[in-house]
Amino acid sequence: MTKILITEFINQNSLENLNKKFDVMYNEKLCENEKQLITIVKDYDGLIVRNKTQVNSNILKNAIKLKFIGRLGVGLDNIDTEYCKNKNIHVQPATGMNADSVAEYVVSSSMSLIKKIPMFHNGTIKGEWPRTTIKSIEINHKYLGIIGFGTIGKKVAEYSSKNGLKVLAYDPYVKEINNKEINAKLSSLKEIYEKSDIISIHLPLTDETKNMVNKSSFSQMKNKPIIINTSRGGIINESDLIEAYNKNNISGFALDVFEKEPIESKFY
């Protein structure tokens, strides 16, 4: 029977279904213990991880039976995909499975920040009455810039355009938009930075995209946009982000991911 090792959290229903077909070893703490993982991975045909398990060459060279790696998520920056390719180890991300969930986060976060809900809430519970001092805006006919127009970026565009936002999308690998459900215009990064009231990032973390959104990027943003990152920490230079916010160059930000997790004190 095929043996599968799971090193991070998986929901109970999925685990039960896997157990019906495979010999499964589940230990969600293994992601924190590379030495132990190196020792036991040699006995398994398959490996299932999230983003904490660093599937590097130290682990892979000991995975002598490994045929496939399942990634419970989309990004593959924690997996040495080049090594896997050379060793004929198939790597399968859960592409598209979380698209609706991420799109809902982007829409709800942008609405919350556009309408200044956190500011109103914080002021009210302090005994203040910020009704006349905090100004919110309507999103109708405002611009949403999407950086990275894959499955999730397209779902964000679909949701957002139905709420009245004008959608600009940047992706060097997308040449045209064929889906009639998606009302978006392919744009340059420069146009997105200059026009957008909200910017949402949906990129993999690579050498090319690391710190891609930085001080230079923020200096080009003319409308003091809201910044939302649900892709990978490290794509935004976090120090530059905080500086841009403190200087009122951006109106706010919502981060679902950070370069270091748990987060550092600079965000407190």
Give the location of each predicted region.
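A short helix->loop->beta-strand "cap" motif at the edges of active sites that frequently abuts
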Residues: 63-68, 87-89, 165, 223-225, ...
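Phosphate-binding beta-alpha-beta segment of Rossmann-like dinucleotide-binding domains, i.e.
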Residues: 87-89, 94-143, 155-162
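Rossmann-like adenosine-cofactor binding region
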Residues: 42, 55-59, 172-268
